[in-house]
Amino acid sequence: MRTFNDFSGLPADRPKLTARQAQILELIRNAIAQTGAPPTRAEIAAELGFRSPNAAEEHLKALAKKGVIELVSGTSRGIRLRTDSLQALNESRISQFSPPVQRLEQLTLPLVGRVAAGSPILAQEHIERTYFFESRLFEQQPDYLLKVRGMSMRDIGIMDGDLLAVKQAREAKNGQIVVARLGDEVTVKRFHRNQHLIELLSENPDFKPIVVQPGEPFELEGLAVGLIRGSLAM
C-alpha cells in the first residue's frame, strides 16, 4: 500500500478533514495525476483495506458534504476534485517543506476552443480566452486548456463544457487520457496501443472505440493532467 501524507490540518478557512478523509482525497488526487481519471469505489476500498466499496462510498459522501469533491451520479468514476480543495491539498504539502510565504509562479493558460483542420492546436485563432492559475494546482504543468465537447468521457467525470488541462506530448502509455487529432477532428479519449493498431476508447457505452488504421492521419497532441469544471471557470 502506498503511503499518504496527513492533510487533516488544513488552514482554518478550509474544511477540516479526518485522517482517513485526507487519505482518500490524496488517493483521488494521485489517481487523477497518474492516469487522468479518479479511482472507482472498489479501487479505493482495495487500496485502503475497506471490506466493501460501500465503506468508500460513505467516506466520499462525507467529503462531498464538506465541499472538497463533487460526486457525479450514475458513473463508477464520477468523482471530481473541486479546484479550491485541490489548491488546499497542495498548499498543505508545500507548507511541510517550505516557508508559508514562499509562493509558486502563476500559470497563464490559453483556452483552446474549436480547432480548424490542418492548423496547430495552439494557433492564435483557436484561443478563446486566457486563464490564470497557481502552478501548485497541477501535479504536472499543463500547456493549455481544452474545452471538452460531448459526453464520450462521461463515466470518468469529464463532462461537456469542462476544461481539460493538457500537457503537450507526442507519446502516451496505455490507459492515459489523451488529446488526439484524427484527420480533421480533435478528440479526448483513453489511449490504447495493441501491437500495430491504436485504439481511442470512450468512457461511455454509447460511444464505440475508434480504431486508427495504418496510414490514417493521426497525431497525439497531449496528455490530460487536470480537469476544471466548466461552471467553476465562468
Swiss-Prot record:
The active site is at S152, K189. GO terms for biological process: DNA repair; DNA replication; negative regulation of DNA-templated transcription; proteolysis; SOS response. Residues 41-61 bind DNA. Gene3D superfamilies: Umud Fragment, subunit A, Winged helix-like DNA-binding domain superfamily/Winged helix DNA-binding domain. Transmembrane segments: none annotated. It catalyses: Hydrolysis of Ala-|-Gly bond in repressor LexA. The keyword Hydrolase applies. Its EC number is 3.4.21.88. InterPro entries: LexA, LexA-like, LexA/Signal_pep-like_sf, LexA_DNA-bd_dom, LexA_repressor, Peptidase_S24_LexA, Peptidase_S24_S26A/B/C, WH-like_DNA-bd_sf. Keywords: Autocatalytic cleavage, DNA damage, DNA repair, DNA replication, DNA-binding, Hydrolase, Repressor, SOS response, Transcription, Transcription regulation. The keyword S-adenosyl-L-methionine does not apply. GO terms for molecular function: DNA binding; serine-type endopeptidase activity. The record marks A117, G118 as: Cleavage. Belongs to the peptidase S24 family. Represses a number of genes involved in the response to DNA damage (SOS response), including recA and lexA. In the presence of single-stranded DNA, RecA interacts with LexA causing an autocatalytic cleavage which disrupts the DNA-binding part of LexA, leading to derepression of the SOS regulon and eventually DNA repair. PANTHER family: LEXA REPRESSOR (PTHR33516), LEXA REPRESSOR-RELATED (PTHR33516:SF2). Homodimer. This is LexA repressor. It comes from Polaromonas naphthalenivorans (strain CJ2). The lineage of its organism: Bacteria, Pseudomonadati, Pseudomonadota, Betaproteobacteria, Burkholderiales.
